[in-house]
Amino acid sequence: MSRAALGEQVERFGDVVYAITADERGKGHVVSVTAVWRGDELAVPAGRRTSHNVETTGAMTLLWPAPAGEPYSLIVDGDAHVDGDSGEVALHPTRAVLHRVARADPDLPSCVTVLDA
């Protein structure tokens, strides 16, 4: 699929996401934030730990939980950087999938690619 398809999915899932980062030792950090498009990147507000992790690894994942009754969550991986002017972290999406949730119909595909850059 394409960046346009990703844009459609992000609009459908809304602006509340979980930002997932890891430090240099691989210790995970998860925070609930809002995401907005800034050009071709998704921007989220960032605290100290999220900023540190992104500065260290250059990576972040955003997770939109499945809405009630829906079979898929949206997961977007990408290259990330801290915007020094805004203090936000910007994610340049490199891969996005719809991932089937645990209680969804098992006959549905477990993973649907939205973006594979």
Regions found by a protein language model. Name each.
Residues 1-117:
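Binding-site signature for planar aromatic cofactors or substrates
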